[in-house]
């Protein structure tokens, strides 16, 4: 017996059998040791016996018992599992004879399985024969398995039933009802049929964006083959989807991958045109399995494709086709392109209506038609980086899964009742230990409450169980209907008209009637604890979760918040009514859903002197909308003064450092499409920056350096500038009004600085007024209240007299600098002295500091707060 003349699988099996013998302290390798390896799950031997009707669990138990009967030998100088037992040696001797007779170069597993029958008295042989597996039957199965081939390589077992092992029969999947229906795409399916019917170049490749339904077209073809809705030349053909991953996985030795692929191709060749091969992600064949000196899958396929011996359908995306397939011209010309475009919203709704029943059965929910329409329209509008119908199907699936999880979870009412009951029971247990009258009285009250709650709890639980059962009945009946329809389809395909008639006119109408009655009952019962309907509201919630864009119906609290948005913004931004109003209106328009869907929510240019609240307004808006001013894309345009720095907004071009990182503007918006973009000090930027902003302002879109389209339709663009601020400072009226002449002067300076095509695209240009003395007082009030809030954490109260506030306002106010000097002045005259007093221990906790003005100087009076 030469181990080198065995196949790799056989060598590994013998090695594993030796390990069993060593672990069990058996001196020699016996027949049961080796057979224990042969019947391991998914092994060649296990599949062989299973196909021939042997109960593997029963057979494995027998092998284990036989191993247990072998005596263990103990000792210090004993070697275990180094030799074969006489029985096993006889099996190998007989196997050698059979292999020579069959003309095999290597000893393979199936020959060893056949040689076992030569051991007439062996319990394993007796078991197999008693269960109907004779030597003749096993030999016939081996001949069928091999298909007349001889074992000429060490990977022989890998090549048996190669298509079954490395592929999925799509036609068989359709027959078993494991495939979703394919709706529409008739034109593309006809194109594929036309290409498959050609004499040469009869290999279609489906090219389209990810998620448009390329694989579904092949599944649709498989469904047509089952329905016999194809030309004569395609009737009774089988489509096998080849799994390239499984083909490559575990190919350890050089040539093993090629051998597996050749085995697949030989099976296809032997089928004489009855098998159509489908390779999803076709580009993977270019370079697949290529190691030093070996061929890749693409080159192995070329000869058969050229001779027309292989019918192959491929599917790949546009980018991958260009990157991999077009580089290999010889391979590319053997395929005929079939372009698969993205379906329209209307087509997507039709597709969703076709899939609706499948999702209802899988999740056990009811999907309303308005949810399907919402999924198609909302995904098309808000999820811009993916394609229909995939993104719409995802929304339906996600919303259905959410409802399903809620159905299986405890309802809020029941959960609250349970928690309250637990709380009262804990209180009852504590009061039992008390002896005073008040506790006894309270205990009686609590026991009464517990009794009431338990009754309410039991009622709720019974109602919930009943509602769940009702929903479960609907789901079961839908499953029954689906099964009956599948049976009808099978009967029609087989030509069993009697069965088809019984199903169509008897069983199916009866189930439909029962289902309708159950659904009507559920509707009239008005399920209050179990929500089993998927409506447009759930779809909107899912879109909101995925994109961060709020599109759900407004709840009462949010309505109030939006209507009072100007007042809320004024709490942070003093004055500037026009600017606050314009920004608030843009947000209200967006949430009402009436803004132009092809433009940003709003684009504003804020003009005015420094320190009047331009940037502060953007921050206040971000805080109000997103609860944090960090949720704002702030770009300081002074960083973009050089021409070359423009590329940082959209990303560096290919070949430059930072190409992989993406643009600062595009990446921020791509990750968070609902945001506020603040372009601060825009006049400082290079003029080329404005060219990039043109399409953002007009169409709400921008293409980054990688060619990815970024959607700006859900952003608010705020640009700030100091252009013309001198006119505003010099010519503002006493009551803070800006004269028409001043406005015209500012606008003319603006037109001189920015191009007309840029200014023309901005929704509103707003002039910020210089701050009046009254505004300054309000700002001081705001700043001092912030300081007082910080001191509260140290248990110190702060009080400023009115004259101090007026004095700070008069001394700190400089119209040219706005509100910024106030902060500096307040730090100098209030915060610094306060800090020194705190560090010196003169302001202990639980004290009050009153700030007064004495002889034109600030005085701090520290008082203790009485407990």
Curated annotation (Swiss-Prot):
Q: Which InterPro entries match?
A: AAA+_ATPase, ATPase_AAA_core, Chaperonin_ClpB, Clp_ATPase_C, Clp_N_dom_sf, Clp_R_dom, ClpA/B, ClpA/B_CS1
Q: What induces it?
A: By heat shock.
Q: Provide the residue span(s) of the region labelled NBD1.
A: 161-342
Source domain of life: Bacteria
Coiled-coil residues: 393-527
GO molecular function term, any single one:
ATP hydrolysis activity
Protein known as: Chaperone protein ClpB
What is the gene name?
Answer: clpB
């Amino acid at each position: 017996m030469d181990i080198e003349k065995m196949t790799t699988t056989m060598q590994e099996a013998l090695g594993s059998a030796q390990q069993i013998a060593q672990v069990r302290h058996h001196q020699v390798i016996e027949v049961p040791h080796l057979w224990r390896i042969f019947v391991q799950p998914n092994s060649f031997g296990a599949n062989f016996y299973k196909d021939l009707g042997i109960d593997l669990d029963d057979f494995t138990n027998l092998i284990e018992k036989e191993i247990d009967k072998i005596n263990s030998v103990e000792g210090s100088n004993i070697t275990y599992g180094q030799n074969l037992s006489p029985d096993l040696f006889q099996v190998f001797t007989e196997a050698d004879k059979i292999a020579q007779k069959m003309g095999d170069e290597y000893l393979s597993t199936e020959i060893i399985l056949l040689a076992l029958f030569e051991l007439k008295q062996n319990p394993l042989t007796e078991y197999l024969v008693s269960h109907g597996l004779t030597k003749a039957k096993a030999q016939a199965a081996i001949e069928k398995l091999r298909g007349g081939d001889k074992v000429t390589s060490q990977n022989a077992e890998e090549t048996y039933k190669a298509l079954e092992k490395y592929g999925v029969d799509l036609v068989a999947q359709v027959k078993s009802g494991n495939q979703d229906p394919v709706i529409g795409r008739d034109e593309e399916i006809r194109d594929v049929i036309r290409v498959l019917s050609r004499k040469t170049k009869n290999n279609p490749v489906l090219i389209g964006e990810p998620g448009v339904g390329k694989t579904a077209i092949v599944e649709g073809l498989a469904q047509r083959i089952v329905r016999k809705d194809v030309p004569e030349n395609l009737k009774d053909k089988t489509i096998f989807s080849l799994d390239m991953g499984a083909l490559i996985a575990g190919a350890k030795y050089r040539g093993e991958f090629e051998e597996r692929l050749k085995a697949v191709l030989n099976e296809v060749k032997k089928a004489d045109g009855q098998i159509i091969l489908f390779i999803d992600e076709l580009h993977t064949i270019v370079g697949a399995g290529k190691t030093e000196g070996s061929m890749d899958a693409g080159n192995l396929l070329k000869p058969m494709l050229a001779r027309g011996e292989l019918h192959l359908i491929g599917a790949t995306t546009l980018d991958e086709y260009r990157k991999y397939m077009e580089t290999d011209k010889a391979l590319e010309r053997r395929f005929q392109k079939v372009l698969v475009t993205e379906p329209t919203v209307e087509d997507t709704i039709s597709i969703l209506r076709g899939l609706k029943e499948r999702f209802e059965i899988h999740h056990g929910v009811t999907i309303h038609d308005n949810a399907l329409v919402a999924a198609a329209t909302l995904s098309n509008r808000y999820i811009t980086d993916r394609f229909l119908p995939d993104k719409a199907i995802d929304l339906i699936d996600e919303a259905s899964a959410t409802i399903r999880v809620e159905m299986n979870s405890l309802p809020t009412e029941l959960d609250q009742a349970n928690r309250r009951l637990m709380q009262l029971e804990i209180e009852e247990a504590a009061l039992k230990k008390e002896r005073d009258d008040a506790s006894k009285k309270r205990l009686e009250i609590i026991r009464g409450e517990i009794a009431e709650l338990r009754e309410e709890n039991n009622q709720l639980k019974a109602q919930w169980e009943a509602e769940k059962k009702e929903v479960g009945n609907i789901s079961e009946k839908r499953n029954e209907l689906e099964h009956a329809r599948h049976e009808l389809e099978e009967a029609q395909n087989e030509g069993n008209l009697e069965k088809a008639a019984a199903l169509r006119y008897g069983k199916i109408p009866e189930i439909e009637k029962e289902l309708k009655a159950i659904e009507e009952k559920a509707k009239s019962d008005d399920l209050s604890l179990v929500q089993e309907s998927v409506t447009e509201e759930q779809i909107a919630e899912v879109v909101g979760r995925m994109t961060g864009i709020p599109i759900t119906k407004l709840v009462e609290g949010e309505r109030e918040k939006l209507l009072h948005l100007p007042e809320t913004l004024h709490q942070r931004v003093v004055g500037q009514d026009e600017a606050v109003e314009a920004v608030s209106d843009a947000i209200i328009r967006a949430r009402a859903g009436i803004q132009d869907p092809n433009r940003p929510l709003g684009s504003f240019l804020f003009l005015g002197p420094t320190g009047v609240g331009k940037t502060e307004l953007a921050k206040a808006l971000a805080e109000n909308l997103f609860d944090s001013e960090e949720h704002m894309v702030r770009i300081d345009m002074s960083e973009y003064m050089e021409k070359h720095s423009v590329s940082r907004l959209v990303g560096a071009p290919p070949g430059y450092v930072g190409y992989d990182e993406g643009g600062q503007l595009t990446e921020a918006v791509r990750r968070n499409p609902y945001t506020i973009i603040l372009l601060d000090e825009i006049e400082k930027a290079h003029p080329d920056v404005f060219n990039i902003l043109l399409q953002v302002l007009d169409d709400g879109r921008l293409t980054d350096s990688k060619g990815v389209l970024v959607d700006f339709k859900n952003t608010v663009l705020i640009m700030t500038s100091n252009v013309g601020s001198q006119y505003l400072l010099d010519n503002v009226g006493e009551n803070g009004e800006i004269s028409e002449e001043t406005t015209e002067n500012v606008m003319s300076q603006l037109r001189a600085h920015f191009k007309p095509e840029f200014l023309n695209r901005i929704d509103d240009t707003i002039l910020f007024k210089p701050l009046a003395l009254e505004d300054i007082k309000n700002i001081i009030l705001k700043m001092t209240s912030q300081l007082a809030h910080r001191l509260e954490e140290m248990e110190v109260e702060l009080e400023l007299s009115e004259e101090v506030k007026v004095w700070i306002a008069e001394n700190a106010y400089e119209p040219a600098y706005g509100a910024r000097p106030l902060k500096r002045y307040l730090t100098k005259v209030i915060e610094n002295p306060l800090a020194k007093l705190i560090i010196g221990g003169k302001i202990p906790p639980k004290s009050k500091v009153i700030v007064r003005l004495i002889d034109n100087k600030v005085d701090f009076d520290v008082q203790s707060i009485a407990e």
